[in-house]
Amino acid sequence: MSRKNQAPKREVLPDPLYNSKLVTRLINRVMLDGKRGTAASIVYGAFDQIKEATGNDALEVFETAMENIMPVLEVRARRVGGSNYQVPVEVRPERRTTLGLRWLVTIARQRGEHTMVDRLAKEILDASNNTGAAVKKREDTHRMAEANRAFAHFRW
């Protein structure tokens, strides 16, 4: 393990349009090669599509989607007596949002729609309706944790 100090967490500034730190983190997650402007136009374009499709506030739909994606439990490998056990642990709040955003963007990139704006909008809409691949990923994670509940006493 490294002996150096842990790097301090940088404060994320809320985005100018929705005044939300979560939206800023989504933009940062979508961003490739430092092209923040492109990433912002993708996210805001997706939010416009969501507003058109639902008639509701896009930020509320996005927050609902994130609640449906973020995992509560996950499994972590723990070595005990020469064998590895998948030990279920609770997910810290910061990691919950990080995992949720990561899964959302990764799965949106794998979708079949023509543009990233369409893919992201459709995946957020699916997640807000408790369907879609990102929600399935969370369910699979929870299922793994539930299946390995017998090893919960190995928690550290």
From Swiss-Prot:
One of its GO terms (biological process) is translation. GO terms for molecular function: rRNA binding; structural constituent of ribosome; tRNA binding. One of its GO terms (cellular component) is small ribosomal subunit. InterPro entries: Ribosomal_uS7, Ribosomal_uS7_bac/org-type, Ribosomal_uS7_CS, Ribosomal_uS7_dom, Ribosomal_uS7_dom_sf. It comes from the Bacteria. Keywords: Ribonucleoprotein, Ribosomal protein, RNA-binding, rRNA-binding, tRNA-binding. Pfam families: Ribosomal_S7. CDD domains: uS7_Bacteria. Part of the 30S ribosomal subunit. Contacts proteins S9 and S11. One of the primary rRNA binding proteins, it binds directly to 16S rRNA where it nucleates assembly of the head domain of the 30S subunit. Is located at the subunit interface close to the decoding center, probably blocks exit of the E-site tRNA. PANTHER family: RIBOSOMAL PROTEIN S7. Belongs to the universal ribosomal protein uS7 family. This is Small ribosomal subunit protein uS7. It comes from Streptococcus sanguinis (strain SK36). The gene is rpsG.
